[in-house]
From Swiss-Prot, chain A:
This is Probable NADPH:adrenodoxin oxidoreductase, mitochondrial. Its main location: mitochondrion. It catalyses: 2 reduced [adrenodoxin] + NADP(+) + H(+) = 2 oxidized [adrenodoxin] + NADPH. It is a peripheral membrane protein. The gene is ARH1.
Amino acid sequence: MSFVQIRHISSQINRKTVSIVGSGPSGFYTAYHLLKKSPIPLNVTIWEKLPVPFGLSRYGVAPDHPEVKNCEETFTTCAEEFSSPTNQKHKFSFVGGITIGKEILLKELLDNQDAVILSYGCTGDRKLNIPGELGTKGVFSSREFVNWYNGHPDFAKDKRFTDFDWSKVSKVGIIGNGNVALDITRVLISNQIDEIWENTDISSLALNLLRRAPVKDVKLIARRDFVHSKFTNKELRELWELEKYGIRGRIDPKFFQKEMFDPSKYDRAFNRRVEMCSEYLKPFNERSKKNYKKAPPPSSGYDKFWELDYLKTPLKINRDDFGAINSLSLCNNRLNEDNSLQPLKDVNNIMTYKVDLLITSLGYAGVPMPEFSKLSIGFDKDHIANKQGRVLTSSGEIFPHLYASGWIRKGSQGVIASTMQDAFEVGDRVIQDLVVSGALSLENSIDLSNIKHTTWKDWERINKKELLRGKKEHKTRSKFLTFEELWNGVEGI
Amino acid sequence: IAAHLLRTSPSLLTRTTTTTRFLPFSTSSFLNHGHLKKPKPGEELKITFILKDGSQKTYEVCEGETILDIAQGHNLDMEGACGGSCACSTCHVIVDPDYYDALPEPEDDENDMLDLAYGLTETSRLGCQIKMSKDIDGIRVALPQMTRNVNNNDFS
């Protein structure tokens, strides 16, 4: 199908039109909620810049967490149900391979649609802004690294990864303390344990390179202290549980001892984290509860280590003669009583870590769309200015018919469950507004016949092929790794 | 770039207001997730849900069904984002304290997810991890409000 009629009135149903920009969990959960809850008939279109759907579920979630990707089943059921031209109340279309702001302008959507919802997530990187961060071999942002091993077509065959000498990577530094930092630690420290990775949908190209790295030591470096770590207990527990493979976690006693934390001052999740760490730091046989003694370390003992390292500020990335990273200079920090952070840059407090690979995992940054300033759409630091999901103009007024949901609404924080909740709340407001608003006086449709794009049917073909390739390689899925392969995947069957 | 692609369809120009008509639509299978078995006579177990608006629904179900399956099979507002694999907190329920102790204790993975649940209470559990059994026949569970904490008064 090459023509998407945005305003659909063929079957006597006057549907209000909604366009959603982005097909990750926030975009799809917003669509799902609208289609499930709206009392008035809707025609919902999801626009996606890649030829394939699901955003961070496909390209962000770690390959060894397939259960987290199960939300894709909900999205698929939803898309299948409302894509078919039956006597459905609502209609749904997926349009892939089109960037709003490029092939189609945001202004055109705003002129055409009864509501537009921006759910395009956080597409930039927060930076350290220190010497050596750019242009040094072996220094990557977490977004680049995660996209690479997840087979994102922008990075899967990037020479910065494929030409890098992985056989020299023994010591790794990861800057940051969120779940992404822990995912990356897990990938790197268990890189040679095939039973974890070989059957997943990890990019085979990336896995083969990662396997070459004799990783022995991964340091997770944070500016603040143990209390301020952002990761969740599930991800931390997964790291501790790697001890059955001879992989041991460490925290220096100056940063962590159970007695430092009065349980009455902290919430349940934090107190559980304290117990987990204090138990796992004990030798296996000295632990008090059986759930910390599920699988003993191998008789050969531990030969790989990950470490939570706190109160450091990275100052400079140092290179060898070939332009590759060889060390990281840092200083100690002081955390003042008012929670402000003070880097101590005097000579006594400066140290150097030898590292062969450095990943900066400082969080994803929201980026405004190119038309925002022209259309006077407000943007606050790293997310779209909004009031409960209704987008604000740069002067703080409500921008009519425009909404935001997910990470681009609030910043890059929270798991899929919280994104889902956010999408539902924004969806409710869109419905509230649509029920009382009049329809557009001018009705337009956007002709896509001259713009290359994919439909839901196209994605079904690509999906089928990837699953088939996966079956042959004994993987859950073998993703197409380039745009060319993805577009070719549309053909046939 | 694509301005020339905008096409105004003249036949559509006449319609200026939206009429909100409720047509006889086909029943959507999309809204029916679960497939629940019908309990054999004499073996029915009862469960009561307290919904977000305070109303109550009681169902007769089979042994072994999870609370998530039961809720989805009856189109209640409960998501199972991870498909019931204990990897998210979207099927969070608050169990009537009278029944809470009759449940097997939560495992670490369930507790790790409950850490992230909205409106967590002392008797919170994940719906996907509770299977119906004779021990909990008659159990009452509340679906949490997202905007406020649910407390034990919701059961009185």
